C-alpha cells in the first residue's frame, strides 16, 4: 500500500484529461496488485484547485481516503516541532500528509521530494523515473 500525494494526483489528472499515458499513469500500472490511498488533505487540496467539482470528486473515487485522526495529529505535531527546530519547515498540509503516511506505515509517492525527504522516517518515492 502507498499514499499518493497531491502533486501526483494533479499530474495524473492532467494525463487522464489529455488521454496521455505519462509517468503517473505508468507508475499506477506497473504493479496492478498495489493498493493506493490518498489523505483527506490531498483530496482537499486537489478539489480546491479543480475546476469542475463533480468531475474532481469522480476522479478521486478509485482512491480510498485516509482520515486525519488523533494519531495523525500527534505525529504531525512532532514533525512540525522537529522541522521548526531545524529551520526546515514545510507546509502544514504536507506535514499532515506525511504524518498520515507515517501512521499507516506506508511510503508516499510524490513529485515534491524536496519537502517530504525532510521528514524523518518517511519513505518517499517518485514516479518520474517510470
Language model region names:
Residues 5-6, 46, 76, 101, ...:
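Generic structural signal for small/hydrophobic residues in well-ordered secondary structure
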Residues 8, 42, 72, 97, ...:
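Alpha-helix capping/helix-boundary segments
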Residues 9-10, 44-47, 117, 125:
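Nucleotide phosphate-binding site architecture
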Residues 39, 43, 53-56, 73-76, ...:
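A general structural signal for well-ordered alpha-helical segments in protein cores
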Amino acid at each position: 500500500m502507498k499514499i499518493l500525494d497531491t502533486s501526483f494526483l494533479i499530474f495524473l489528472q492532467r494525463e487522464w484529461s489529455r488521454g496521455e499515458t505519462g509517468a503517473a499513469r505508468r507508475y499506477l500500472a506497473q504493479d496492478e496488485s498495489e493498493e493506493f490511498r490518498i489523505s483527506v488533505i490531498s483530496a482537499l487540496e486537489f478539489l480546491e484547485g479543480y475546476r469542475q467539482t463533480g468531475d474532481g470528486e469522480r476522479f478521486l473515487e478509485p482512491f480510498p481516503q485516509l482520515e486525519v485522526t488523533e494519531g495523525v495529529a500527534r505525529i504531525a505535531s512532532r514533525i512540525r516541532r522537529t522541522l521548526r527546530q531545524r529551520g526546515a519547515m514545510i507546509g502544514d498540509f504536507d506535514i499532515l500528509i506525511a504524518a498520515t503516511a507515517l501512521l499507516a506505515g506506508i511510503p508516499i509517492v510524490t513529485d515534491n521530494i524536496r519537502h517530504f525527504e525532510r521528514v524523518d522516517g518517511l519513505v518517499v518515492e517518485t514516479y518520474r523515473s517510470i
